[in-house]
Amino acid sequence: MRIDVVTIFPAYLDPLRQSLPGKAIQSGLVDLRVHDLRRWTHDAHRSVDDAPYGGGPGMVMKAPVWGEALDEIASAETLLVVPTPAGVLFDQATAARWSAERHLVFACGRYEGIDQRVVEDAARRMRVEEVSIGDYVLPGGESAAVVMIEAVLRLLDGVLGNPASRHDDSHSPALDRRLEGPSYTRPPSWRGLDVPEVLLSGDHARIAAWRREVSLQRTRERRPELLADPVGPQDDPGR
């Protein structure tokens, strides 16, 4: 997979060189290329923004600069991702779908965003998705791009040391899109808090049933909208 990120702050993407994403890059599973948008400017000030038509606060990123950048980087096979609080909500299903792509390009806007004509022009020759990572506003698209790229990379074969660890992730199909339950490790007792007895029993069927129940309980309490049928067992699964 190849991933290109266009931004005016290339160093913002440096965390992707760490941990599992970094290993994926070093091993050649992912070809990550980060580009400074100012490379496609032609004025002495290397300006990438201008005042918005119609008035209003803030500045808008200029179409000609973005157009040249995408002309050079993207192709008809590209999926262009534009992080924006006005986009559709990014989720695990989106990450899974993108993990099958050969080429992703992230266009990271700043200020009041990118001139909408950039999206409209790109959509004439490639697929474009405007995507949000949540109902809040960030200073720019870089941190959202890091979040989405990490979510995609961990789904690629060879990135995780144990691929089975994806099986019971929150929002995974194996959990019917529910939340993953709590995890515990040694010691069995710590500061007066004990690991649930069922996890020490060695009874794998009972443990699996407990995990299903706590997953349902946690989802009901924290994200009830994820449940097709919010009415379910009310038993305490921690015993």
UniProtKB/Swiss-Prot annotation:
Alphabetized InterPro entries for the sequence: Alpha/beta_knot_MTases (IPR029028), tRNA_m1G_MeTrfase_C_sf (IPR023148), tRNA_m1G_MeTrfase_TrmD (IPR002649), tRNA_m1G_MTases_N (IPR029026), tRNA_MeTrfase_TRMD/TRM10 (IPR016009)
Family: Belongs to the RNA methyltransferase TrmD family.
SUPFAM superfamilies listed in its UniProt record: alpha/beta knot (SSF75217)
UniProt EC number: 2.1.1.228
Keywords of the record: Cytoplasm, Methyltransferase, S-adenosyl-L-methionine, Transferase, tRNA processing
GO molecular function, one term: tRNA (guanine(37)-N1)-methyltransferase activity
Any one GO cellular component localisation term in the record: cytosol
Full protein name: tRNA (guanine-N(1)-)-methyltransferase
CDD domains: TrmD-like (cd18080)
Gene3D superfamilies according to UniProt: 3.40.1280.10, tRNA(m1g37)methyltransferase, domain 2
One example of a Gene Ontology biological process annotation: tRNA N1-guanine methylation
Reaction equation(s) it catalyzes: guanosine(37) in tRNA + S-adenosyl-L-methionine = N(1)-methylguanosine(37) in tRNA + S-adenosyl-L-homocysteine + H(+)
Domain of life: Bacteria
Functional summary from the UniProt entry: Specifically methylates guanosine-37 in various tRNAs.
Comp. bias regions, Basic and acidic residues: 165-180, 217-226
Region (Disordered): 163-187, 217-239
A Pfam family this chain is assigned to: tRNA_m1G_MT
Record: residues binding S-adenosyl-L-methionine: G109, I133, G134, D135, Y136, V137, L138
Cleaved signal peptide residues: none
Compartment(s) where it occurs, according to its Swiss-Prot or TrEMBL record: Cytoplasm
Subunit structure: Homodimer.
